[in-house]
Design a protein with these regions (language model features):
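Glycine/serine-rich phosphate-binding loop and adjoining beta1-alpha1 elements at the start
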Residues: 38-42, 46-54, 60-145, 211, ...
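A Rossmann-like FAD-binding core segment of flavoenzymes
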Residues: 201-250, 272-281, 308-431
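A conserved FAD-binding loop/helix module that cradles the flavin
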Residues: 300-305, 310, 447-475
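Residue-level detector of alpha-helix initiation sites
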Residues: 95, 159-160, 184, 297-301, ...
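C-terminal structured "cap/appendage" subdomains that terminate the fold
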Residues: 405-407, 411-413, 417-464, 479
Length: 483
């Protein structure tokens, strides 16, 4: 018996050359050709007990795919070169694989059984190739709903949770209207993730499909200002709040209101709007500037890549955690994500452009240095992380480590506040199982659980749709009983 995982090395999506791609906003990666992707799927075929599709939490850690993608099944079909059935199987659990195949951090790969001793199966690359190939072949077509129930559902927010809920409810026959405060549909998929990572044409293509299937979209509607939840509840049979985690965290240090301090989402949104033909405000333009990105996550990396494309003189990224190791640490056993050091697309670009990795670790920002009202630098200290025997970590300041970094533009990418205060502004309180304290009003996605992964947002959208459908069915039963 031939063990393909031993004879076939892991391979991921082909990428454009760094020196080429930093001069435009086109996607940096593309799908695999049939031959290589079949080989990658074959690496999955010797698995005895798959965990990649489990989709659960251990503490706050995601184990496997939260939407329970049938990964071993579509890998088998790809290995047999049956791409159409692989596409069908993929769509059984995932409304938007063209999104997850581009921007999901792939917890499935961290829980891949092969990853215990070898490089895991390139699941994310296979997923993207399946769906991109399906679009190329013309297999992805509008699914027309045969019969309408007569119920009307309003969904506030058009991110992955809202769109997934809309898709599910529409296919169940309910009439769905999605309300979005921005001028484009997609939420953070559209304005929070840069084009080189997720082309906006990919987002529009899916929105066009959903619209062709009967979903109605309204942009420029700010619920809470233009219309209240109470008013919507009077107009619709059910309302879903899928407004996401909206309030970005700020630095909270002296000088953080200076000119030149910008929040990451505002910066990335302005960049995408420029691609759509809008003028770029000078405060969101990194050209010729020394840029510091505070925050070591994916959004921070996207800011690094965007600043490079704008022509930044230099880019430095502050992270509060230590540098990761090259191999899985003992305290992160399988099936947890290995959380190892990797050179993301943005860091490869920074190394290619500036001949240096932009990442610095264990940095605490203490004060913004200003001249007049404008930022010119950041005073910092280096930290040391000590892990106690009980597993809890403590950070200490390294004596004598003070350093001032010059900066013309500081991008703050340290996440979002909890969503509960934003919900209260809309007049509702979130309760368990997607319901709120207002009858017929539901909540899902980051608006319910706080900032999370795209796959959790899709799962929440699918699950809240089940809750709403059951609620509407109960309303119908009560109506029949009363009559």
């Amino acid at each position: 018996m031939r063990h393909n995982f031993l004879s076939i090395p892991r391979e991921t999506l082909p990428e454009r050359g760094v020196k080429d791609r930093i001069h435009d906003y086109g996607e940096y990666a593309s799908r695999m050709e049939d031959g290589p992707i079949v080989k990658q799927a074959e690496r999955c075929m010797d698995c005895g007990t798959p965990f990649c599709h489990v989709g659960d939490l251990i503490g706050q850690e995601t184990i496997g795919c939260p939407i329970h993608n049938l990964i071993p099944e579509w890998n088998r079909l790809v290995s047999d070169q049956d791409f159409f059935r692989a596409y069908e199987r993929l769509m059984e659990t995932n409304n938007f694989p063209e999104f997850t195949g581009r921007v999901c951090p792939a917890p499935c790969e961290g829980s891949c059984t092969l990853g215990i001793s070898e490089d895991p199966v390139a699941i994310k690359s296979i997923e993207r190739t399946i769906i991109d190939r399906a679009f190329e072949q013309g297999w992805v077509k509008p699914r027309h709903v045969r019969q309408r129930t007569g119920y009307r559902v309003a969904i506030i927010g058009s991110g992955p949770a809202g769109l997934a809920a809309a898709d599910q409810l529409n296919q169940l026959g309910h009439t769905v209207t999605v309300l979005e405060k921005a001028d484009e549909i997609g939420g953070l998929l559209y304005y929070g993730i840069p084009n080189m990572k997720l082309d906006k044409g990919v987002v529009r293509r899916r929105v066009d499909l959903l619209e062709a299937e009967g979903i109605r979209f309204k942009t420029g509607v700010n619920v809470g200002e233009d219309v209240t939840v109470e008013a919507l509840r009077g107009e619709y049979d059910a309302v879903i709040l899928a407004t996401g985690a909206q309030k970005q965290r700020t630095l909270g240090i002296d000088g953080d209101d200076a000119s030149g301090i910008e929040l990451a989402m505002d910066y990335l949104t302005a960049s995408t709007k420029q691609l759509n033909g809008k003028d770029l405000d000078s405060r969101h333009d990194a050209e010729g500037k020394h840029v510091i990105v505070i925050g070591g996550g994916d959004t921070g990396a996207d800011c690094v890549a965007t600043a490079i494309r704008q022509g930044a003189a230099s880019v430095t990224q502050f992270g509060k955690h230590p540098e990761k190791g090259l191999y899985r640490a003992p305290e992160r056993p399988w099936p947890l994500q290995p959380d190892t050091l990797s050179t993301d697309y943005a860091y490869a670009e920074a190394i290619g452009q500036y001949e240096a990795d932009p990442r610095t670790y264990l940095i605490r920002s203490n004060q913004i240095v200003t001249e007049g009202d404008k930022v010119v630098g950041i005073e910092t200290e280096r930290m040391e992380k000590i892990v106690k025997p009980d597993g809890h970590a403590t950070f200490f300041v390294v004596e004598g480590s003070e350093k001032t970094y010059p900066a013309d533009l500081v991008l703050v990418a340290i996440g979002f506040e909890r969503p509960e205060p934003e919900l209260r502004k809309l007049g509702v309180e979130s309760k368990r199982d997607y319901v709120t304290d207002v009858d017929g009003v539901f909540v899902a996605g980051d608006a319910r659980r706080g900032q999370s992964l795209i796959v959790w947002a899709i799962r929440e959208g699918r699950e809240v749709a089940e809750k709403v459908d059951a609620y509407l069915e109960t309303c119908q039963t009560e109506l029949k009983t009363s009559s």
